[in-house]
From Swiss-Prot:
Pfam family, one: Sre
Keywords from the named record: Membrane, Transmembrane, Transmembrane helix
Protein name: Serpentine receptor class epsilon-31
Gene (UniProt): sre-31
Gene Ontology biological-process annotations: sensory perception of chemical stimulus
Family from the record: Belongs to the nematode receptor-like protein sre family.
GO cellular component: membrane
Membrane topology summary: Multi-pass membrane protein
Cell location: Membrane
Record field: transmembrane: 28-48, 61-81, 121-141, 165-185, 192-212, 253-273, 283-303
Domain of life: Eukaryota
Chief subcellular location: membrane
Gene3D superfamilies noted in UniProt: Rhodopsin 7-helix transmembrane proteins
Amino acid sequence: MIIKNTGTSTFIWLPVYFYNEPLNLKLVISIFELLSYILCGYILNLSIYVMSKIQLFHKNLMFLTVPLFAIWYELIIGKFITIAYRLKIVNPGVELGEHTVFWTNDPDKILEVGGSSGLELLIFGGFLQWHTIYSIVFGILAVATERTIASVYIKDYESKKRIWIPIFLIIICQVLAIFMTFIVINRKVHPIIARLPFIFLCPISFAVWLFVKNKNKTLQKEIQNPKRTRIFTLSQQCQVKENLRALRLGTRLVAVVLVYIMVCFLGIVSLTFDLIPGVCGHFVENFLFFHPIPICLTAMFSIPRWKTEFEKSYLPWKYRRNLRKIRQMSMEIEEDSIKKISLETDLYFKQLAESWI
C-alpha cells in the first residue's frame, strides 16, 4: 500500500493490504485469521520452551536464534493494527478503499491524503512489519556470523561464554534493520534497493555455510584420525559436533525459508500485475504470517530430543495415555514376576518337605 501526503508531497510505503469486501465477510476472515494466529503462537511458544529447556547449542547461538523466533509477535501486532483498520474499529478519517499491490506508481492505486492524521497507528503497524522482515534477514546473517566465529575460535569457544559476541551482533542487526525500515517506509529507495538485503542474504549465507561445513568436516576427520598429532580437548570435540549439528538443522530451515520466500514473492508479483484476483491477497498475506508452523515444526522434528519433548508438550494426552500403558505393563510384569517367585518358593519348600519324608 502506497500513501501520498499531498500536503508535503511525501510517500509512505506500507506492507499492508485492504480489500473491497462486505463488513460481514471481513469479520469472518478476521476471526479465521485470529484463530490461525493463536495456533501459530501456540506452536511457537512450545518450540521456544523446548529449545530453552533442552539447550543443545552454545548459549551465544541460543541468544541469537530465540529472538528470531519470538519476533513473530511483533509482526502479529502490526497485523492486528491492520485488522482494526479493516474492520473500522479505528477510524482513519478517510476511505481507504482497495489496495492489493505491494508497489505501484499508478496514481489510481495510491491513497492520497491531506495529512497523516488518523493514520498514525496504521503507519506504526506497517513500521512493525517492515522492522520484523529486516530483523529476520539481518538476524540470519548474525547467526551465520556467530557460527563462523565459533569455527574460528574452536580452541576455547565452547568453554568460554563471550556474551559480548551475540550482544554486539544484535546491536548491529537492529541498527541495520531500523535504518532499512525508515528509508523503505518513507519510500526513499527504489524497490530493487529495498530487496538488496534479501539478494545478498543468499550468496553470503551460502558462502558461510560452505566455510563452516568444510572447516568442521576437516576438524572432524582430524579428530577421528588415530594417527593425528594434534590434541583436541573434549570441549573442542563437542564444539565441532555442535557446529555440524547446527549446519544440518540450518540447512533444513534455510530450505523451508527459501521455499516460503519464493512462494510469497510469486504471490506478490501476481497481485502487483493483476495476474490473480485481489481477494487472493488474503492467501498470499497470511501465508507469510503462518511461517512459524513449518519453520518451528522443521526445527522440532529435526532433532530427536527436541522432537520427543515437543510431542510430550504438544500432545500431552497422548503422552499421558502412553505413560499409563507403560506403567500398566510394568505392573503386570512385576505381578507376574512376584507370582513366579512365589510359585518357585512354594515348589522349593514342597520338595524340601518331601525329601524329609
